[in-house]
């Protein structure tokens, strides 16, 4: 419901590698200039040292309803998750725990989770008291329609705290089950959660590891815990292989290798599952612009160029090839623009992106003649995943055409800039970082 860290960071003060102190963003909602704040958040200390942060804050909510939904099949719990989101309901939390985690938590805290359940969901909604009960009842209906065995509401703050104690203490409770555990942190589209959980179980069985699942189901962020003993060198090798295969499986399902734990060194080689060498070249160029001497947290995130990676090329999964094909297809549709840019660069000409021309009056006149680049040929829907509420469209698609496509599925892009009309392109929306009156509903 509230998004991730970058949605709440308004501004930063940071020290660059040469000692210069700079500010990015600030308390104003729409600072001018490039969004360096967005570049810094998530950079893992590789671009600068943050010394001061301005964040967005919210008032405490008026009412909270916390529910515990019980399931006999973990796949049914996963179905409830994406059906709730697909219904247009955004709980502030949707957390899942499977049978192994339930037992571990009950042994440690006695939270009242049913030990015979295959999975439980902790679902919490909050907001004004008026209407909140209706939202909770709709969630309960969806859960029962997806084979929930039982669902109950916490009666008071003490009961709510007890439910949350189990979730907060889950990792500590699991520590009693084995000398060590490997925490995976990969993400899949919500509709792929049942399949992802099946593959996690299959991989764990393949290598002979017990696995427990406790994770942020609402955004598809998996946390399989593989139990092992690091004193056993074979287990240590095998658990790394299993973790790698779980990441591969998530990428195969349209997900990614990390949801919130970052990349650092541990997942550096796995970056090749989701990025091409051209992608890395761009990221290395950004790193070099901030840190040309490579003094800040060197060697993190981006794998080195060449053949220095830990994983052999044969282990890189098929989705990279699929993505390469997708890029090839995109390049084919964008070929005229690519050719125009190459030609302009060779002749040292300036270029100016153009859509339908409806917003050409924004900004100042070019300081020198510029070659227009027409994006209107890029007007198709590239991929539309309605259940996961994601659409990818060409930059030349008009705002009106996009909204019309979405409305056929009872969806919309929640932006209505006052100066926009149906013929304006999505590219212009991005270029101007345009916003509308609904921004306040999304924490804006």
Report residues per predicted region:
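FAD-binding subdomain of flavoenzyme oxidoreductases
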Residues: 1-95, 296, 314-319, 415-416, ...
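A glycine- and small-aliphatic-rich helix-loop capping segment at beta-alpha/alpha-beta transitions
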Residues: 5, 29-30, 53-59, 111-112, ...
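C-terminal substrate-recognition/cap domain of FAD-linked oxidoreductases
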Residues: 55-59, 65-242, 249, 253
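A glycine-rich phosphate-binding loop feature that marks nucleotide/adenosyl-phosphate handling sites
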Residues: 95-107, 153-167, 216-221, 260-270, ...
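Glycine-rich N-terminal segment of FAD-binding domains in flavoprotein oxidoreductases
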Residues: 216, 227, 250, 330-385, ...
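Alpha-helix capping/hinge segments and adjacent helical runs
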Residues: 251-263, 288, 292-296
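Intrinsic disorder at enzyme termini
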Residues: 276-337, 348
């Amino acid at each position: 419901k509230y998004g991730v860290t970058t949605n709440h960071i308004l501004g930063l003060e940071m020290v660059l590698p040469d000692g210069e102190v700079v500010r990015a963003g600030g308390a104003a909602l729409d600072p001018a200039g490039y969004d360096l704040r967005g570049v810094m958040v998530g950079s893992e200390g590789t671009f600068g040292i943050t010394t001061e942060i301005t964040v967005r804050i919210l008032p405490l909510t008026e009412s909270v309803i916390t529910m515990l939904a019980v399931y006999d099949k973990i796949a049914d719990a996963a179905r409830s998750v994406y059906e709730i989101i697909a219904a247009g309901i955004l709980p502030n939390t949707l957390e899942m725990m499977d049978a192994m985690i339930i037992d571990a938590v009950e042994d440690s805290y006695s939270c009242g989770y049913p030990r015979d359940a295959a999975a439980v969901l902790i679902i919490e909604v909050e907001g004004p008291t008026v209407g909140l009960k209706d939202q909770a009842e709709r969630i309960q209906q969806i859960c029962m329609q997806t084979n929930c065995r039982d669902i109950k509401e916490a009666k008071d703050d003490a009961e709510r705290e007890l439910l949350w104690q189990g979730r907060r203490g889950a990792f500590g409770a699991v520590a009693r089950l084995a000398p060590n555990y490997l925490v995976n942190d990969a993400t899949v589209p919500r509709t792929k959660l049942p399949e992802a959980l099946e593959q996690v179980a299959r991989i764990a069985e393949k290598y002979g590891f017990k696995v427990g699942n406790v994770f942020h189901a609402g955004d598809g962020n998996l946390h399989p815990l593989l139990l092992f003993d690091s004193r056993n060198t074979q287990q240590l090798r095998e658990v790394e292989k299993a973790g790698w295969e779980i990441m591969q499986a998530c990428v195969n399902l349209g997900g990614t290798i990390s949801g919130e734990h970052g990349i650092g060194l541990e997942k550096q080689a796995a970056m090749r599952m989701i990025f091409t060498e051209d992608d890395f070249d761009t990221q290395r160029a950004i790193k070099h612009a901030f840190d040309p001497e490579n003094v800040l947290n060197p060697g993190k995130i981006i794998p080195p160029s060449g053949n220095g990676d830990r994983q052999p090329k044969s282990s890189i999964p098929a989705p990279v090839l699929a993505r390469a094909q997708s890029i090839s297809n995109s390049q084919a549709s964008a070929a005229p623009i690519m050719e125009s840019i190459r030609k302009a660069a060779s002749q040292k000409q300036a270029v100016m992106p153009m859509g339908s021309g409806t917003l050409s009056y924004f900004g100042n006149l070019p300081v020198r003649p510029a070659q227009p680049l027409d994006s209107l040929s890029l007007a198709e829907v590239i991929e539309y995943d309605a259940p996961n509420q994601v659409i990818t469209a060409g930059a030349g698609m008009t705002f009106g055409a996009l909204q019309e496509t979405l409305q056929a599925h009872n969806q919309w892009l929640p932006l209505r800039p006052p100066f926009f009309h149906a013929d304006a392109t999505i590219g212009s929306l991005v270029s101007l970082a345009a916003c509308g009156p609904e921004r306040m509903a999304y924490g804006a």
